[in-house]
Swiss-Prot record:
SUPFAM superfamilies: Peptide methionine sulfoxide reductase. It holds the Pfam family PMSR. GO terms for cellular component: cytoplasm. This is Peptide methionine sulfoxide reductase MsrA. The gene is msrA. It comes from the Bacteria. Keywords: Oxidoreductase. Belongs to the MsrA Met sulfoxide reductase family. The keyword Transcription does not apply. It is an enzyme of class 1 (oxidoreductase). Its EC number is 1.8.4.11.
Protein backbone atom coordinates (compact mmCIF):
# COMPACT_ATOMS: atom_id res chain seq x y z
CA UNK A 1 0.00 0.00 0.00
CA UNK A 2 1.20 3.50 -0.83
CA UNK A 3 1.80 5.53 2.32
CA UNK A 4 0.14 8.89 2.90
CA UNK A 5 3.58 10.52 2.93
CA UNK A 6 4.25 9.10 -0.54
CA UNK A 7 1.03 10.61 -1.90
CA UNK A 8 2.27 14.04 -0.84
CA UNK A 9 5.25 13.52 -3.14
CA UNK A 10 3.74 11.37 -5.91
CA UNK A 11 0.88 13.44 -7.31
CA UNK A 12 -0.36 10.58 -9.51
CA UNK A 13 -1.62 8.33 -6.70
CA UNK A 14 -5.12 8.48 -5.23
CA UNK A 15 -5.55 7.92 -1.49
CA UNK A 16 -7.76 5.25 0.01
CA UNK A 17 -10.70 6.22 2.17
CA UNK A 18 -8.60 5.40 5.23
CA UNK A 19 -5.76 7.66 4.08
CA UNK A 20 -7.96 10.61 3.12
CA UNK A 21 -8.12 13.72 5.28
CA UNK A 22 -11.13 13.91 7.64
CA UNK A 23 -12.53 17.21 6.36
CA UNK A 24 -15.34 18.95 8.17
CA UNK A 25 -19.13 19.05 8.47
CA UNK A 26 -19.53 22.73 7.58
CA UNK A 27 -19.73 23.62 3.87
CA UNK A 28 -17.85 26.59 2.47
CA UNK A 29 -19.68 29.92 2.59
CA UNK A 30 -20.72 31.02 -0.90
CA UNK A 31 -21.90 34.34 -2.35
CA UNK A 32 -25.63 34.53 -2.93
CA UNK A 33 -25.39 35.61 -6.57
CA UNK A 34 -23.32 34.67 -9.60
CA UNK A 35 -20.60 37.24 -10.31
CA UNK A 36 -21.11 37.13 -14.10
CA UNK A 37 -24.86 36.53 -14.33
CA UNK A 38 -25.81 39.49 -12.15
CA UNK A 39 -28.94 38.91 -10.11
CA UNK A 40 -28.88 35.15 -10.74
CA UNK A 41 -28.73 33.09 -7.54
CA UNK A 42 -25.56 31.03 -7.58
CA UNK A 43 -27.38 27.86 -6.53
CA UNK A 44 -30.92 28.75 -7.56
CA UNK A 45 -33.82 28.50 -7.43
CA UNK A 46 -34.01 28.87 -11.22
CA UNK A 47 -37.53 29.68 -12.34
CA UNK A 48 -37.15 30.06 -16.11
CA UNK A 49 -36.40 27.42 -18.72
CA UNK A 50 -36.08 23.65 -18.64
CA UNK A 51 -33.19 23.46 -16.18
CA UNK A 52 -30.70 20.61 -15.88
CA UNK A 53 -27.27 20.14 -14.31
CA UNK A 54 -23.97 18.79 -15.63
CA UNK A 55 -20.70 18.15 -13.78
CA UNK A 56 -17.35 18.22 -15.58
CA UNK A 57 -13.70 17.99 -14.53
CA UNK A 58 -11.15 19.09 -17.14
CA UNK A 59 -8.20 20.53 -15.29
CA UNK A 60 -7.97 23.80 -13.38
CA UNK A 61 -11.54 24.84 -12.67
CA UNK A 62 -10.90 28.58 -13.15
CA UNK A 63 -10.53 28.35 -16.92
CA UNK A 64 -13.07 25.57 -17.31
CA UNK A 65 -15.76 27.54 -15.51
CA UNK A 66 -15.18 30.59 -17.71
CA UNK A 67 -15.62 28.61 -20.92
CA UNK A 68 -18.93 27.20 -19.71
CA UNK A 69 -20.40 30.48 -18.44
CA UNK A 70 -19.62 31.94 -21.88
CA UNK A 71 -21.83 29.30 -23.56
CA UNK A 72 -25.29 30.49 -24.53
CA UNK A 73 -27.91 28.56 -22.60
CA UNK A 74 -25.81 28.19 -19.45
CA UNK A 75 -27.57 30.02 -16.61
CA UNK A 76 -25.14 29.45 -13.74
CA UNK A 77 -21.81 27.80 -12.90
CA UNK A 78 -20.21 26.81 -9.61
CA UNK A 79 -16.77 25.32 -9.01
CA UNK A 80 -16.05 22.65 -6.45
CA UNK A 81 -14.49 19.31 -5.62
CA UNK A 82 -15.86 15.80 -6.24
CA UNK A 83 -14.96 12.17 -6.71
CA UNK A 84 -12.99 11.72 -3.51
CA UNK A 85 -13.55 11.07 0.17
CA UNK A 86 -12.97 14.20 2.25
CA UNK A 87 -16.16 16.14 3.11
CA UNK A 88 -16.07 19.91 2.55
CA UNK A 89 -12.34 20.09 1.81
CA UNK A 90 -10.31 23.27 1.50
CA UNK A 91 -8.41 24.08 -1.68
CA UNK A 92 -5.13 23.42 0.10
CA UNK A 93 -6.34 20.00 1.22
CA UNK A 94 -7.37 19.09 -2.32
CA UNK A 95 -3.98 20.22 -3.64
CA UNK A 96 -2.26 17.95 -1.12
CA UNK A 97 -3.63 14.91 -2.96
CA UNK A 98 -5.06 13.53 0.26
CA UNK A 99 -8.76 14.08 -0.43
CA UNK A 100 -9.16 12.05 -3.63
CA UNK A 101 -11.18 14.86 -5.20
CA UNK A 102 -10.83 16.40 -8.63
CA UNK A 103 -11.67 20.02 -9.47
CA UNK A 104 -15.12 20.22 -11.06
CA UNK A 105 -17.51 22.71 -12.60
CA UNK A 106 -21.22 22.34 -11.91
CA UNK A 107 -22.98 23.69 -15.01
CA UNK A 108 -26.62 24.77 -14.76
CA UNK A 109 -28.18 24.95 -18.21
CA UNK A 110 -31.47 25.53 -20.00
CA UNK A 111 -32.16 22.49 -22.18
CA UNK A 112 -34.27 24.65 -24.50
CA UNK A 113 -31.13 26.61 -25.44
CA UNK A 114 -28.23 24.19 -25.12
CA UNK A 115 -28.25 20.40 -24.94
CA UNK A 116 -26.21 18.08 -22.78
CA UNK A 117 -24.67 16.79 -26.00
CA UNK A 118 -23.54 20.35 -26.82
CA UNK A 119 -21.83 20.57 -23.43
CA UNK A 120 -20.19 17.17 -23.89
CA UNK A 121 -18.76 18.36 -27.20
CA UNK A 122 -17.30 21.39 -25.42
CA UNK A 123 -15.89 19.18 -22.68
CA UNK A 124 -14.01 16.85 -25.01
CA UNK A 125 -12.66 19.60 -27.25
CA UNK A 126 -11.54 21.97 -24.48
CA UNK A 127 -8.95 19.69 -22.86
CA UNK A 128 -6.75 16.65 -23.38
CA UNK A 129 -8.62 13.69 -21.86
CA UNK A 130 -5.70 11.26 -22.34
CA UNK A 131 -3.34 12.70 -19.73
CA UNK A 132 -4.39 10.81 -16.61
CA UNK A 133 -3.56 12.64 -13.40
CA UNK A 134 -2.64 15.91 -15.05
CA UNK A 135 -3.77 18.56 -17.49
CA UNK A 136 -0.97 20.30 -19.31
CA UNK A 137 1.52 21.67 -16.80
CA UNK A 138 -0.91 21.10 -13.91
CA UNK A 139 0.02 17.79 -12.30
CA UNK A 140 -1.95 15.97 -9.62
CA UNK A 141 -5.01 13.83 -9.04
CA UNK A 142 -7.09 17.00 -8.61
CA UNK A 143 -6.63 17.75 -12.32
CA UNK A 144 -7.88 14.42 -13.66
CA UNK A 145 -10.61 14.37 -16.28
CA UNK A 146 -14.11 13.28 -15.27
CA UNK A 147 -17.77 13.44 -16.21
CA UNK A 148 -20.16 12.96 -13.32
CA UNK A 149 -23.66 12.23 -14.57
CA UNK A 150 -26.90 13.27 -12.90
CA UNK A 151 -29.12 10.74 -14.72
CA UNK A 152 -28.89 7.40 -16.54
CA UNK A 153 -29.50 9.25 -19.82
CA UNK A 154 -26.50 11.51 -19.18
CA UNK A 155 -24.39 8.45 -18.37
CA UNK A 156 -25.32 6.81 -21.67
CA UNK A 157 -24.70 10.00 -23.66
CA UNK A 158 -21.33 10.55 -21.98
CA UNK A 159 -20.12 7.04 -22.81
CA UNK A 160 -21.33 7.29 -26.41
CA UNK A 161 -19.57 10.62 -26.90
CA UNK A 162 -16.40 9.24 -25.32
CA UNK A 163 -16.30 6.39 -27.82
CA UNK A 164 -16.84 8.78 -30.72
CA UNK A 165 -14.12 11.16 -29.53
CA UNK A 166 -11.73 8.27 -28.89
CA UNK A 167 -12.05 7.29 -32.54
CA UNK A 168 -11.05 10.80 -33.61
CA UNK A 169 -8.20 10.97 -31.09
CA UNK A 170 -6.83 7.65 -32.29
CA UNK A 171 -6.83 8.88 -35.89
CA UNK A 172 -4.76 11.87 -34.73
CA UNK A 173 -2.23 9.69 -32.89
CA UNK A 174 -3.37 10.28 -29.33
CA UNK A 175 -3.62 7.56 -26.69
CA UNK A 176 -6.53 6.19 -24.72
CA UNK A 177 -9.01 8.45 -22.95
CA UNK A 178 -8.56 8.32 -19.17
CA UNK A 179 -11.70 10.29 -18.32
CA UNK A 180 -13.71 8.87 -15.43
CA UNK A 181 -17.42 8.60 -16.28
CA UNK A 182 -19.69 7.82 -13.35
CA UNK A 183 -22.91 8.69 -11.59
CA UNK A 184 -22.55 12.00 -9.80
CA UNK A 185 -21.08 11.87 -6.30
CA UNK A 186 -21.48 14.69 -3.79
CA UNK A 187 -20.05 17.98 -5.04
CA UNK A 188 -18.41 20.06 -2.33
CA UNK A 189 -18.37 23.69 -3.38
CA UNK A 190 -15.06 25.53 -3.41
CA UNK A 191 -14.28 28.65 -1.43
CA UNK A 192 -15.95 31.92 -2.46
CA UNK A 193 -12.80 33.40 -3.98
CA UNK A 194 -12.64 30.55 -6.51
CA UNK A 195 -16.16 31.20 -7.81
CA UNK A 196 -16.02 32.97 -11.21
CA UNK A 197 -12.35 33.62 -10.47
CA UNK A 198 -11.35 34.74 -13.96
CA UNK A 199 -14.19 37.27 -14.11
CA UNK A 200 -12.82 38.86 -10.94
CA UNK A 201 -9.19 38.39 -12.05
CA UNK A 202 -9.13 38.63 -15.88
CA UNK A 203 -5.35 38.25 -16.04
CA UNK A 204 -5.39 35.18 -13.80
CA UNK A 205 -3.90 31.82 -14.70
CA UNK A 206 -5.76 29.61 -17.15
CA UNK A 207 -4.08 26.36 -18.12
CA UNK A 208 -6.95 24.87 -20.10
CA UNK A 209 -6.12 23.72 -23.63
CA UNK A 210 -7.45 21.14 -26.05
CA UNK A 211 -5.87 18.66 -28.44
CA UNK A 212 -7.06 20.32 -31.63
CA UNK A 213 -9.16 17.22 -32.32
CA UNK A 214 -12.88 17.77 -32.90
CA UNK A 215 -15.88 15.52 -33.12
CA UNK A 216 -17.04 15.13 -36.73
CA UNK A 217 -19.82 17.60 -37.66
CA UNK A 218 -22.42 14.82 -37.70
CA UNK A 219 -21.72 14.13 -34.01
CA UNK A 220 -21.28 17.67 -32.76
CA UNK A 221 -23.87 19.64 -30.87
CA UNK A 222 -25.21 22.95 -32.10
Amino acid sequence: MVLRSEILVNKNVLPTAEQALPGRETPMALPEFHYVFEGTPLLGPFFEGDIDFAIFALGCFWGAERRFWQREGVVSTVVGYAGGFTPNPTYEEVCSGLTGHTEVVLVVFDKNKVSYHDLLTMFWELHNPTQGMRQGNDVGTQYRSAIYCTSPQQLEEAKTSRDAFQAELSKAGFGEITTEIAQAPTVYFAEAYHQQYLAKNPDGYCGIGGTGVCLPPSLQGN
